[in-house]
């Protein structure tokens, strides 16, 4: 599944964080260690998820309510054993 064509849904309060600088600042501020577990609520298209999985965090758990986005997240990150 591709995320293209999926628009943010007001009922979920969705917006897409795309600014690479802001995403990097979030991960940097978290100061993640190898044994940390991260819970990401509302990963959307996975922009932050991607950076979290590139960090030293042990695991990244993501909860997405929009069923239209779940398969895309699984397709994109499902092979990573830390996701």
Per-region residue spans from a language model:
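Catalytic cores of RNA-modifying enzymes
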Residues: 1-83
